[in-house]
Amino acid sequence: MGALLGKYKKAVMYFPGGCSIGARPIDLHLKGFEALGAKVTNEKNKYIVEAEELKGANIYLDIASVGATINIMLAAVRAKGTTVIDNAAKEPEIVNVATFLNNMGAKITGAGTSTIKITGVDTLHKCFHEVIPDRIEAGTYILIGALCGNQLKIDNIIPEHIDSLLSKLEEIGTELEIGADYVIVSKSDRYKSTNIKTAVYPGFPTDLQQPFTVLLTQCNGKSKVMETIWENRFMHVPYLIQMGADITVKNQTATIIGPTALTGSEVVATDLRAGAALVAAALIADGKTRITNIEHILRGYENIVEKLTSVGAKIESHEI
């Protein structure tokens, strides 16, 4: 929406969807557009955002939203004057988008900090840009390596982007070799329990909480996972319990007692990261696991079946 608004001064979008992990309002996006001078109307299940002219503004985000930060940047690069986003998200993806826009002629400073300054320009030009590796995909495969890997190498990644994950893995006793653009991971014979609390970057990513929960079922003792970002991020837990895990959930905290052996079962991928967690659980479970609703998994993990089978996993994918 931000790019369309910046270039064409109008954007029309039907109400958004996505994984059912909690409320996904776009009020921060719309608030930012309105601050830049746009008018927002809502009719027949769609948003219409339009402006005769966009003007720079000071915008404070009530929540450090990645999507809102990017959307406002996209619109503000073509606004008249200067825009300042306070309490901006700091994720690596923000920095990468800002670098991309600057390569096209935008004037953005402060990306990666809580305050981003954008000075509008009249035009943008084409450029060459390299998208950063997916840190959540990398983290998921590292967690799978911690569960059942033997010198599993995850290459072409940026380890600094998943520092919080790597620190927790080292804390519980994971065997890691961390290079400039790779991580080599092996399963440990004895893992220690730990507690994690999800947070905005550079804290522990909510998108890795679900697969990390699977690893915690193999740790000795009691572990706790506190989810602070999404209210429905424990949808995978009933299926892990069905497979033999000892997990209780109260409010937004899961308590995991381990280690427990897991057994193959019929499970459902309720969302993208829950699906990834169930794949991880299936790889260490005794027997066969059947996962349905795999479209959630496939849209977020390119060639996941091929990648895992290439390193020894026994996985088959079938269309129903």
Residue ranges and their predicted role:
Residues 1-320:
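Structural preference for solvent-exposed beta-strand-turn elements
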